[in-house]
Structures are given as structure tokens and as C-alpha cells.
Amino acid sequence: MSLRFVIGRAGSGKSTLCLHEVQEELKQRPRGETILYLVPEQMTFQTQQALIGSEDVRGSIRAQVFSFSRLAWKVLQEVGGASRLHIDEAGVHMLLRKIVESRKDGLSVFQKAAEQNGFFEHLGSMIAEFKRYNVTPSNVYEMWQQLDAHSSSAEQKLLANKVYDLQLLYDDFERALIGKYLDSEDYLQLLVEKLPQSEYVKGAEIYIDGFHSFSPQELEIVRQLMICGARVTITLTIDEKTLAQPVNELDLFYETTLTYEKIKQVAREEKIEIEKTIPLMEQPRFHSPALAHLEAHYEARPNEKFNGEASVTIHTAANLRAEVEGVAREIRRLVADENYRYRDIAVLLRNGESYYDVMRTLFTDYNIPHFIDEKRPMSHHPLVECIRSALEIISGNWRYDAVFRCVKTELLYPLDVRKETMREEMDEFENYCLAYGVQGKRWTSEDPWMYRRYRSLDDTDGMITDSEREMEEKINRLRGVVRTPVIRMQKRLKRAGTVMQMCEAVYLFLEELDVPKKLEALRIRAEESGDFLFATDHEQVWEEVMSLLDTFVEMLGEEKMSLSMFTDVMSTGLEALQFANIPPSLDQVLIANIDRSRLSNVKATFVIGVNEGVIPAAPMDEGMLSDEERDVLSAAGIELAPTTRQTLLEEQFVMYQMVTRATEKLYISCPLADEEGKTLLASSFIKKIKRMFPDVKDTFITNDVNDLSRSEQISYVATPEVTLSYVMQQLQTWKRYGFEGNLDFWWDVYNFYVTSDEWKQKSSRVLSSLFYRNRAQKLSTAVSRDLYGDKIKGSVSRMELFNRCAYAHFAQHGLSLRERDIFKLDAPDIGELFHAALKRIADRLLRENRTWADLSIKECEHLSAVVIEEIAPLLQRQILLSSNRHFYLKQKLQQIIFRTSIILREHAKSSGFVPVDLEVPFGMGGTGSLPPMEFSLPNGVKMEVVGRIDRVDKAEDENGTFLRIIDYKSSSKALDLTEVYYGLALQMLTYLDVVTSNAHTWMKKGGTASPAGVLYFHIHNPIVEVKGDASEAEIEKEILKKFKMKGLVLGDADVVRLMDNKLSTGSSDIISAGLKKDGSFSARSSIASEQEFNVLQKYVHHTFENIGKDITEGVIDIAPYKKGNKAACTFCNFKSVCQFDESLEDNQFRTLKDMKDSEAMEKIREEVGGE
């Protein structure tokens, strides 16, 4: 029994010496004693290859490469002890979840923390750490007693409570495992116990290579190996000079020196012979003088400079994507020009979550075979999501999001269905569920679902159309596709008495959905498309899910568990599932994490993402215990993993390892911005490298090739997939600026695409965008007639929409596009309710031959409640009756109608105008409808403007009859003559024209009527500010002012007084007008003469004719208006359709100039030739 150390700096040949010794031994004595070669887990594959890579050694039974965990399996299979069931990380998390849930009421700190994402991952890591450092539950309990007895400050009490919780959970976890299960850490403890019984290890020649430190648990394994083996050889990266000096924590080799001393101490304790240490002084790894200099002088202060050409390259990239593309281009150059193999190259990084997706995409585009040494979570796989969401459906009462997350996995679809068709149908089905607010009992009820197209509050005929019946049948068929398998599992879960039966319900759910066959189909499809990584994913995920169910049953099978806990435990297990890495092929670029990688035999290393806070790493407190808490435990005798401070001290060694992997070339790079454009800073480590290699230039990498020389641009020509984007970039620059530059070279590349049989069609789709103009071509007469018909019948709102944006009109009225209907109460729904409520009250008053003025306050309250109760079941599929929140909203809406009724009562008392009709249709056909506003367009098309007028008021005096329009609005609005001029506000003047043209309808003896004005009535329940001693009358007066109607009224003092008979001088509280003492109107009055009203009405006719002409002639320009801070696009539903983009030459707003009313009126006169 002896111990031998082989030490040396990085690249000195320690591993090579050991491998050569093993290979020589195998040649000399192929059937001798066992040779064990122990390495970290991530080194096993490459070490096995290196061991049998010699021409003289093609295989061996005598020598085996192991990690500690694999050695544990080997020994336990030999001597026994492996009969207990192994539980993996997912099983550990599930067991911990169950323990925490059952212990929740007794936990002090973790009761609420258990609900946070990542809690069980941290808890599992903490328990694993306890085990690695030989800390037992009783040790933790003793620590709690000690802390609890001496806790005085809040921080000390918090730590004591935290340790108490950890002790409870750790003890429960260990009790659950005893005699039944083994987790990964238990195998190592068993290995310690069983090694003395192993004949396989007894007398073996043992090599331990690639480690820098050992946990106490691993150190115990090393102890037993030294006792059992013939000789143990351990390699450590240490400079021999370091061993001759006192240990200093700032020394580069501090960590490995401590390891060296610990192992020697163990050897002394066990009286193991310590052979003479073998120091290696040469640097055989480095073929480059610059890299040899970097290794030899890495820790030197001040930095030793290397003068001359260096094989070290530094790049700064514009952004992360540019950095990765730069790496890809250089890898292709090394392979093409310098005869590198892909396996000779490695990419090292730390923040993989920012890089991996980009690297997968770009390396694939550049045709670079690669292997990412990182396990991927299974959480996003359709199978995992299907199980998780299906359980959420059941435990969460069939919420919309859970249901359609499950649907979108496509595993609920019948096996033989055409997926494209089913996707379209499910999209329609989802729209139905959103529109009808389907969730909860609606899913579980046996009653069939109904489908009715929502029309209006007045549509109560109840007749179902053929298309509605057909849609109803489809909806119920699709409901069955979703509902049937989940309901079946729900019933089984509710009947289940044990966890085993619950797991069986999940398994049967998957089997009855034919999930294995569906996954096999996905695997075949992935293989056919050449995506072999995803093909293996579909195989792995089924095996892992089945293993998870087996583990669940093995651990907790006979226990009873609530559905919610079962769902939580299962979700925790599913979250922990990971795809196993497929071993790399013989020729791939290795992409690995700096902290975990153990590379060898690479010629070139790319270290990317070297940004401040990443390399070196910024201090971060992660996990269950903070650094301060770890220090307290350490002082009390419990050794745990290094603190952040210790980790930062080790960071220099990590970076040293990172830059000494390559034999020929080192590339270091950092991006100046991340994928979202956020600024990043270069690491101070780059400055250190620059000081060591002052002749190395920092090269800037960009995605924009325009600023590069011709020779530099040539390097951007890689694969056809990648190069196409750069061709586009160059030609776009040429098109926009006419810049020639290196365009002759890019034209050659362009010619390749347009002449290549393989790329002609693919590239044409991309290159066509070069000449893309986001312009909507005018519709032909034939198409226009097909879309709109030979007779146009449209509302005033439709005409206004055309003037806001012709393309939006085309999308809505030509293509009939609309947003999906969602079960929610929007402003239009509330507006419709207000209109209907006031109409019902007014209709009742007309039937009773009463006016608003006749109502009492109590009647206003009663009537508002009655009409809201009548309307609520008719509005938006009974949305106001669907929940407590909406019921509360119904009460608030009733209060608004009540307040509005009081104001209308006050208005009626003060006005000579009385309502004579409500919701007056024109051009709608049927009894009571006024005729439409008709136009014969120059191209022969007939156009009718139709609509419905909220309220018509009439007043009479000795000067004649006057009619005015009142329009109810749920928001404040005024009549802007500028918007009238631009055709954006035509509604009120159109209504006034219609009623005055048909005045005989409301006049007993026939005759004509004059326009009195148009006014907006704002329906709301305002809050007013008054003095503390204000009377109720004063408060009511202030509220009345908030209801002042805005609009445009006839500039006749007598007519204005008819609208407000309390007005003598000053401003009216009812309308936006006021009188001076001399009887003239105040400056702020919104008035127009009768002649001006006539001009406005003529202008409205003129505008409609122009709109009709443009519609029928196919005008669909993408030309939205913009006036001040208002724009047509602000609330437009069709932005994703027109793709309006101001950066495009053809896409510009029609900027409308704001004008005073007098200016606008003058322009209107000019248009119609009015006086």
C-alpha cells in the first residue's frame, strides 16, 4: 500500500504520464491485477478513448475508467448492497415535496418558501451537500440546539429556525430512504463501507486524475482506496515551488495545495507509505510559445509581457449574436485552411442560458457539428406539458389556460386525424371558449354546449340558423376530444385510494391517448428531417416519465394523498426531468461550461462571453444558506461547501485552467450588448491578457459588413444559409444609398443564388423582399364589386373609418376581418348597455305619457335597477351574471344609470326641448325607420348611409319648430370642426340632416323644422370636489356641471334659452354656450348659424360622395391619419395585417393640421361653395 503524487502546472503532462504507464502495463501484463483509473464524471468518455487510443492497446478488461459513482455501482454489484431502489433527482424532489407538504404546519421558515420556484431543487442540493460533507441529521439537530440556546439577534433566530426546519426535513428524508432507497450520495457512502470487502479493488493499481479537490465523503473513498489498493497515484495541478512555501489563500494553487496536504494527512493516519512526489517541469502540451508564456507567467505580478506574434486572439463583438457568428466563421476557417478537425476545437463559456439556443441555431446554419455538454430540461416537451396541464385542469377546476396548454401539446388529438385540420378546428374551438368564458362546471356538465352568434340586445327572436347548428355540432365534437380523456382520468383519480392507483390513472390516460404511438410518429418525423437530437428526445421522455411513475409508486405507492398534493408532487418530479446527453461523435466541436469542463487534446479554445460579472464571476448568494450563515456553522464545527468568498478565491484557478486547455490557439471574446440590446462591459480579465500580450489587437466583430474591407467581407461568405442574409444586407444598402463599395463581389454571390438549381427558389422568396414595398394596390372594379356589391349600404362610422385609414376599412368591410371575441366587458358593451337602459326607461315614460321631468329621485333609482336587471341576462352571453366581480360591476353600472336619470330629470325641468323619439333607425327597413341618406355615385353605384340615432328632441316657439340630436357617450366628447373637415366626425351632422329632412315624422301638421344643434351627453357617475361645509344642493349643482353637454348649437339666443330656461346671462350649466349681458354669445360658446348648419350638411353630403367613389374604385391605401397626438393606428385592430412601418418609404402618416373652428368652417365653405 503506497501513495504517489504526480504534480505539475497545467500542460506539464500529468495525465499523459499516467495513461502511458497504464498502457505500458497493459502491453507488458494484459492479465495482471486490476487497474482503476478514476476521473470526474465529465472526463470518463474522453479518458476511455485516450486509454484505448494507442496502437498497442485496442481494448482491455484489466484497466477500467470510472467516476466515483460508477465505481460505487461496480463494487455494490460485486459485494451486494445495490438491492435498494435508486431514486434519481426527480424522485428526490418528489419525496421532498411530499415531506414538506406533510410537515408544513410545523415549519418555521420554509412554510411559505416552499411555494417559490426552485425551492425543492435548493432543498435537494442542501441535503446532498450535507451528505457529501458527512453531516448527519443528528449533527444538524445538535447544531440547532446550540444555535437556539444562544440566539439573541433576529439574524441568529432566523438561522436557528432555518436549521431547525432543515433538520426536520433531512431527518424525515433519511427515514423515508432507510432500507428501501438510495440516492446518488448514498451510493458514495455505501462505497466507503463496502470497499474493504471488494476483491475487485483489493491489490489494484489506482490512478486518480483530473480532480482539484475532494469533499469529505470523497476523501473517505480515497482513504479506503489507499487501504485496499496496491498503490494510489494522484495527479494534482500544483507548481512544485508552491509546496516549499507556507500555504497562502491568495496563491493560484491554494485549493490543490490544500487537497495535497489533506490526502497526505489521511495517508499518515492510515500509515500508508508516501512515495516520492513526481514533479513535472516541462510544458509538452503547448505548441505555441505564446500559450506556454501565458501558462508559465499567469499569476506573475506585474504581468510578464510577451513580445512578438502571439497565438492569442481577442475579439469584442457588437452583440452576442455577432460574437457567436464570429466564432463560427473562425472555426470554419481553421477547418478549411489549417486542416483542423472539429474535435480539435472547444468553446468554453459560463452563462450558457444566454448562449446555447443561439449557438445551436448558428452552428447548425454554419454546418458545424457540435456537442453541447449540458443537460436540457424536459419541462417543455409535449408529453411532460400534457401530464402537468391535464392534472392542473382537474385540480384547478378546468381553467382556460390549463385546458388549452394541454390541447396545444396535440397529444389529445385522435391518432389518425390530420393534424393541420385539427389545429384549425381547435383554434376555432378556443375562440368559442374565449368568447363564452367556458371553464369550470361547463366542462364537466353533460349538457351540450350552445352556439349563437351574438347580434345585439334587441335580437331576441331565438331562432338558430343552419350555420349556427353546424358550428354547434363541431364545438360539441371537439369538446368531446378534449373532455373525454381528461374526465376519464379525473374519475379514476377521485376513485383512487392510493398513490399507486393515482399513478395508474395517469398511465391509463397516456395509453388511451396512444401517446407511445404518437411519440414514435414524432421521432420518425424528426429523423426524416435530419434532427436526430429531437428524435432521441421523444424516446427518452417516455422512458423517463415511466421511470418517474415507477419511482412514485415505489416510494409512496400505498399511501393516501389528496389530488392537490398528488398534482404538486407529480409536477415537482416532472420539473426535475432532464434529457441525457448523447455521447459526442468522433468529430464535433465541444461546447462546455468553464466550471465543469475537463478538456484535453484540443488545439484551439474559444472562451466566449468574457464579460464583467461573468468571468470572473460576481459574488452571488444562492441556496438555502448565506455566506454569513455558513461561516457561523463552520465556526461551530460543521464543514460545508465553500462560501462565496472562498469560491471567488478559487476563481483565478478556474480561469487559469480555462486558458491553458489549448495546445495551439486561444481566442477570447466578449459582446458589448446582449440579445435584448442591453449594454455589457468587457471583463477585467481581458485587460490582464492585453497587458501580457501588448502586440495583440482587439478586433471588433459586427453583423454589418459595410464598414469592412473586401478581404474581411469574404470571410462572411460561409454556407448558403448564412450568406444569404449578408447578400440581402449589402443589396439593401445599395438600394437605399446607392453605395457601390465592394458590391461587385456581392453581385457574384447574388448570381450564385439566382442561377443555382438548389437555391434559386429558396433565395427568390428572401431576395424578393429587397424590392418589397408595403403598398396596397388599388382593387380592380370587378374585385371591388365582388367585395362590396353593386349597392353599398354602410353606417356613418364606416365612412369615418375609411377617412381614418382606407386599408382599415378594406380589412373590416372588404375582408370582414375581426378580432377574436373574448368573454369580457369592453367599452362598446358598456356603451350598448347604457343606450339600452336609457331607451327602456324613456320608452316606458312615452307609454305612460310622462317625461323625465315627472320622475322622482326614488323612481329614478327604481327604474335604473329594473332596466339593468332586464338587460343583464342579454348582454355579452350573461357576463354580468358570471361572477361576483361582474355582479359588483353590474351594481356600479346601475348607479351610473341612476345618476344619469337624475341629470336627465334636471335637464328636462330646465328645457323646452323634449325627447320625441329614441334609437331612431334610418335606412334600416321595417316599421318606424326613416329613409336612408342616398347617393348615386359617378360610376353608377348606389350608396346608402344608414344608422340609428340615440335621441331626437323637439321644441316649438313662435319662430317655428326646432330639432336637436342627443348622442349618449360613455366618455367625454366634443364636436371638433377640424375633424368634420377631414371626414373623421360626420355622425352627429348626418343625424341632424336626416331628422330635419324628415321633420314631418314628429310634426302633427307636417311642415319643416330648423336644426337646433347636436350635443353629446356623457354617461358617467362623476366625483366632484367641494368645500367641507357645502350643502347637498351645492354638491348637486357641481355634479350637474359635470354633465354639461358639448357639441354645436344654433346661434339663436331664444333657442339656447329653450335648451336652458334658467339661462339669462353667463354660462349655461346644461350646454356649452353662454350669453353676455347684451344678449350676444360668449366667446367660448359652441354655436353655428342656420346657414352654417346648412353648409355643414352640404359638406357631409359632399364627403360621403367622395368616400363612396373611392371605396367603389378600390382605394385601399395604407395611409392612416395623424393629428396631434391622435392617430388611426392607436386603437386599430388591423396593425398586424397592414404591417404599417414608418421606416419604409411608402408608409407615412397623413398628417392632418389642427385648426381653429373658424378656420375649419372657412375651408368647409370653400369645398362646397357656401357663402
Swiss-Prot record:
InterPro entries given in the database record: ADDB_N, DNA_helicase_suAddB, DNA_helicase_UvrD-like_C, P-loop_NTPase, PDDEXK-like_dom_sf, PDDEXK_AddAB-type
What sections of the protein cross the membrane?
none
SUPFAM superfamilies registered for this protein in UniProt: P-loop containing nucleoside triphosphate hydrolases
Query: Could you say which residues bind ATP here?
Result: G8, R9, A10, G11, S12, G13, K14, S15
Enzyme Commission number, as recorded: 3.1.-.-
Domain UvrD-like helicase C-terminal residues, every copy: 281-587
Question: Any additional notes?
Answer: Despite having conserved helicase domains, this subunit does not have helicase activity.
Q: What is this protein called?
A: ATP-dependent helicase/deoxyribonuclease subunit B
Task: Provide the species name.
Answer: Bacillus cereus (strain AH187)
> Taxonomically, what lineage is the organism?
Bacteria, Bacillati, Bacillota, Bacilli, Bacillales
